[in-house]
Amino acid sequence: MARARQEGSSPEPVEGLARDSPRPFPLGRLMPSAVSCGLCEPGLPAAPAAPALLPAAYLCAPTAPPAVTAALGGPRWPGGHRSRPRGPRPDGPQPSLSPAQQHLESPVPSAPEALAGGPTQAAPGVRVEEEEWAREIGAQLRRMADDLNAQYERRRQEEQHRHRPSPWRVMYNLFMGLLPLPRDPGAPEMEPN
């Protein structure tokens, strides 16, 4: 590798040798743009899923520090308590909000009670969908477990059949054990080891 560095060519990675520096994992691959709402991070396209299909807990969290978010009246963390009720504030003018904060402050049409205050509750339709998904996943897991158990039993029985001698071999061994073999008169009954 040192010679390749001197020659200016890129060294080929060799298994078993440590690299000079660890390569950072591209975290962008873990968070595709479809997961982000598109308003919180500039440069990302808007998500293909409509906000009405997502419960409030799946919306993007505010990117501002918690103290700034608390000063704006937002949640300290996603899905947390709200200190003030929703609606226009009668005591003064509304503060101007960035598009991301407007997105976080806007109620989801299918679940207005989910954002109204108090602990976050998913919309009834979303809860039913999640329960259906959980049931389907549980049924799939049970079917997979049953298939694996059946496959294990089949393999175990095949192994037993494979190791079990055939009936012809059993009869041959029986007859050969019962029949006296012809021996020389001076040969011992049993051969020494």
UniProtKB/Swiss-Prot annotation:
Induction: By DNA damage, glucocorticoid treatment, growth factor deprivation and p53.
Region (Disordered) residue spans: 1-32, 71-131
This protein's GO CC annotations: lysosome; mitochondrion
Keyword annotations of the record: Apoptosis, Mitochondrion, Phosphoprotein
Gene Ontology biological process: apoptotic process; apoptotic signaling pathway; cellular response to hypoxia; cellular response to ionizing radiation; determination of adult lifespan; DNA damage response; execution phase of apoptosis; fibroblast apoptotic process
Subcellular location: Mitochondrion
Modified residue annotations for Phosphoserine: 10
GO molecular function per UniProt: ATPase binding
Motif BH3 positions after renumbering to this chain: 137-151
Pfam families: PUMA (PF15826)
InterPro entries: Bbc3
Cited function: Essential mediator of p53/TP53-dependent and p53/TP53-independent apoptosis. Promotes partial unfolding of BCL2L1 and dissociation of BCL2L1 from p53/TP53, releasing the bound p53/TP53 to induce apoptosis. Regulates ER stress-induced neuronal apoptosis.
UniProt remark on domains: The BH3 motif is intrinsically disordered in the absence of a binding partner but folds upon binding. Folds when bound to BCL2L1. Also folds when bound to MCL1.
Similarity field: Belongs to the Bcl-2 family.
Subunit structure as annotated in this protein's UniProt entry: Interacts with MCL1 and BCL2A1. Interacts (via BH3 domain) with BCL2 and BCL2L1/BCL-XL. Interacts (via BH3 domain) with NOL3/ARC (via CARD domain); this interaction prevents BBC3 association with BCL2 and results in CASP8 activation.
Protein's recorded name: Bcl-2-binding component 3
Source taxonomy: Eukaryota, Metazoa, Chordata, Craniata, Vertebrata
